[in-house]
Amino acid sequence: MKNISLLGASGSIGTQTLDVLRSHPDQFRLVAFSVGKNIDYAVKVIQEFSPQIVSVQREEDVLKLQAVSGNTKIVYGSEGLLEVALHPDAEIVVNAVVGSVGLLPTLRAIEAKKTIGIANKETLVTAGHLVMEAARKHNVSLLPVDSEHSAIFQCLNGENEKRISRLIITASGGSFRDKTRDELHHVTVEDALRHPNWSMGSKITIDSATMMNKGLEVIEAHWLFGIPYEQIDVVLHKESIIHSMVEFEDRSVMAQLGSPDMRVPIQYALTYPDRLPLSDTKQLNLWEMGTLHFEKMNQERFRCLRFAYEAGKTGGSMPAVMNAANEVAVEAFLQKRIGFLTVEDLIEKAMNHHNVIARPSLEEILEIDATTRRFVMEQI
């Protein structure tokens, strides 16, 4: 029986993580979780899983939950998030929160020697050098939950990582993959939220449409697998059947395939190095697919992917700036305050405005995050 702490239980990854726990009640126990403002959902999860600690975002929601939570301790805010991450009984901490708020809980959980199921891209994007350094220092495993990184992780099982020639990350292309840049001037929030292949939260669905999601994944892969950016490629693959590939020095290519279902990589992270049945996911029959398609990525068409490569290669504090600018811009687009292509413009402005710090401390990263957010808000 593995004890799980889940950060971000009401989001897309969080709800699918709970599906996995539900499927294997003899294997996993939920000891703590956090939610944002979805208190009705939190009540249902408490009643079903009886965790010891639950954290909510706002203090005013604590009393509401305490009235129905029985013996479950209710905490709130950033301190509450840390309490969930550091629950003494938790063996695995699944970080499924959205945005850079996931950074501090991850670092503290690593210091407490918890195994990390990492679904929060922004943690590695903003502070990859600090996170990987801490993981090495405390001998902690970072197990990828993203389908692409899980695919690479599985392809590398038993392989000599020094023999890697390149990583090939697949991209569905998002909601607007078939639109021209001229057509993108007129797209709506509702259009952007209709992803062709995956069921995801609103922020990541917009990131998928701008291709920033894939850019964040490139930076994440660089840190997780220690591969230079020059050896990480992205290929457009509309069917989302091949989740990523690894090419070795002898030009052999290993690929991980499966029907698009986030519960598969989530469960693999929780059961690693073992596997368990996942009976209600769709079996992949290639003869039903017929044909798989691949296209070279155009970084002028998908400018956010180019920004991510530039930020990653520049290094230091630049990825944190790009990430903060993107979070503010995407939120403004979701609120219908800016157009879709303005997201790219705001990120570019923030990156051009920033003076890079080569090796920022945690305090400097948090300060850069805050100042970048203020700068972008002033531009809107």
Curated annotation (Swiss-Prot):
SUPFAM superfamilies, alphabetized: 1-deoxy-D-xylulose-5-phosphate reductoisomerase, C-terminal domain (SSF69055), Glyceraldehyde-3-phosphate dehydrogenase-like, C-terminal domain (SSF55347), NAD(P)-binding Rossmann-fold domains (SSF51735)
Binding site for Mn(2+): 146, 148, 217
Cofactor: Mg(2+); Mn(2+)
Binding site for NADPH: 10-13, 36-38, 120, 122, 201
Binding positions for 1-deoxy-D-xylulose 5-phosphate per the UniProt entry: 121, 147-148, 172, 195, 208, 213-214, 217
Recorded metabolic or biological pathway in which this protein acts: Isoprenoid biosynthesis; isopentenyl diphosphate biosynthesis via DXP pathway; isopentenyl diphosphate from 1-deoxy-D-xylulose 5-phosphate: step 1/6
UniProt EC number: 1.1.1.267
Catalysis: reaction(s): 2-C-methyl-D-erythritol 4-phosphate + NADP(+) = 1-deoxy-D-xylulose 5-phosphate + NADPH + H(+)
Keywords, comma-separated and alphabetical: Isoprene biosynthesis, Manganese, Metal-binding, NADP, Oxidoreductase
Pfam families documented for this protein: DXP_redisom_C, DXP_reductoisom, DXPR_C
GO molecular function, one term: 1-deoxy-D-xylulose-5-phosphate reductoisomerase activity
BP-aspect Gene Ontology terms: isopentenyl diphosphate biosynthetic process, methylerythritol 4-phosphate pathway involved in terpenoid biosynthetic process
Family, per entry: Belongs to the DXR family.
Function: Catalyzes the NADPH-dependent rearrangement and reduction of 1-deoxy-D-xylulose-5-phosphate (DXP) to 2-C-methyl-D-erythritol 4-phosphate (MEP).
Protein name: 1-deoxy-D-xylulose 5-phosphate reductoisomerase
Source organism phylogeny: Bacteria, Bacillati, Bacillota, Bacilli, Bacillales
UniProt gene name: dxr
